[in-house]
């Protein structure tokens, strides 16, 4: 087992990994408003044997989520919280991510002309609701302030209920259970965090759990056309096996494999925290190379794709995540961290950072602001998206100073 005191200290390299992935996510998510984006930056189309930068970011973020799990749970135990209380906290966080994911994903269908508000107003109200319910309010200095914060939460709930009941998509459909990215994070976090509660930092249990997710992915992902084009376990539809995976929200195992990989690396990092920097760098990069080689081997049998969570994609992205964390940890140990200040809010107020773009998009929709055409094509379009990502982080920083920060 690891020295539990390691988990009481914040790991800056995890914050950096989370910040880099969120910054990149904001950057690539803004591509919808520009044109002529290089293919290697974009999402691959379904069935394409390719992963662009946009395809790599989300799995890397899931890996970072996994790295945070041991620290978050061990800190709760160190503060005296019980396993039951910690499980309740995990369920609460999962519920928050599912709710936020549903509101964001439903809005991506846009709105029916009969809706009582345009999409921009929907996004404004959504942000107000999220902040009202999940803001990290300062400790109340008086009973009046405590009641005020409670009122803000109630207002937030009422705003979200109003949106849910009045939402209509362009086909007239009502608010649906579409979880989106945040929901996927929520379900994956739930699975891996519950496993950690039962296993703690005992790798003899966590490594088989990761191996099980990998095995599910290997057996359940369709092979290349040259090998038949079907999964090794090609059961008929509505079978018990797939039904159980669906109930547990494991899917084909790819998403929890990313997160459980992060959990394992986090434990190894804590366990060998006292080793020399050179030792950690060599071993971390060696593991990354081995994962890369396994990815190359599996690529012979499966295409590499984010959509469908293919085995080569799992191994490639895990290799990237391990290598990136190893390098970041090395930079931290050598105090090369000044650059991190530029994107720090994306690592310490990550959920707020993810919400801020919708406020900007809402403002653009309501006001009718349109970017000049020369700023939406090719290289200048990429500069546009890069500047937007930095502006989002700057706004998040200001919001933190004003005590506005989402905390679930």
Where are these regions (language model features)?
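Alpha-helical transmembrane segments and their immediate juxtamembrane cytosolic regions
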Residues: 1-408
């Amino acid at each position: 087992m690891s020295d539990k005191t390691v988990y009481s200290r914040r790991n800056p390299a995890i914050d950096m990994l989370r910040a880099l992935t969120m910054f990149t996510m904001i950057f690539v998510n803004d591509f919808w408003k520009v044109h002529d984006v290089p293919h290697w930056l974009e999402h691959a189309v379904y069935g394409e044997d390719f992963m662009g930068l946009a395809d790599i970011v989300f799995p890397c973020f899931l890996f970072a989520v996994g790295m945070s799990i041991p620290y978050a749970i061990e800190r709760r135990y160190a503060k005296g919280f019980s396993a039951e209380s910690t499980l309740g906290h995990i369920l609460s966080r999962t519920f928050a991510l599912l709710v936020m994911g549903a509101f964001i994903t439903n809005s991506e269908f846009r709105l029916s002309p009969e809706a009582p508000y345009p999409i921009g107003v929907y996004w404004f109200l959504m942000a107000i609701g999220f902040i009202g319910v999940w803001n990290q309010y300062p400790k109340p200095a008086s009973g009046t302030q405590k009641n005020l914060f409670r009122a803000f939460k109630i207002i937030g709930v009422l705003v979200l209920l109003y949106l849910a009941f009045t939402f209509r998509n362009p086909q007239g459909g009502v608010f649906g259970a579409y979880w989106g990215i945040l929901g996927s994070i929520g379900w994956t976090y739930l699975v891996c965090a519950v496993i950690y509660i039962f296993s703690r930092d005992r790798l003899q249990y966590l490594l088989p759990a990761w191996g099980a997710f990998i095995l599910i992915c290997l057996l359940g992902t369709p092979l290349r056309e040259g090998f038949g084009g079907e999964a090794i376990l090609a059961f008929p539809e509505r079978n018990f096996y797939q039904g159980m995976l669906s109930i547990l929200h494991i899917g084909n195992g790819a998403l929890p494999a990313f997160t459980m990989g992060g959990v394992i690396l986090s434990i190894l990092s804590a366990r060998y925290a006292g080793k020399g920097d050179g030792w950690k760098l060599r071993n971390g990069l060696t593991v990354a190379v081995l994962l890369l080689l396994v990815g190359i081997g599996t690529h012979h049998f499966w295409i590499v794709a984010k959509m469908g969570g293919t085995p080569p994609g799992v191994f490639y992205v895990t290799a990237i995540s391990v290598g990136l964390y190893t390098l970041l940890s090395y930079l931290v140990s050598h105090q090369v961290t000044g650059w991190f200040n530029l994107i720090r809010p994306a690592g310490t107020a990550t959920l707020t950072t993810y919400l801020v773009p919708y406020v900007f998009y809402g403002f653009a929709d309501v006001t009718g602001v349109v970017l000049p055409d020369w700023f939406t094509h090719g290289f200048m379009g990429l500069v546009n998206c890069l500047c937007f990502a930095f502006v989002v982080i700057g706004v998040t920083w200001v919001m933190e100073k004003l005590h506005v920060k989402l905390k679930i």
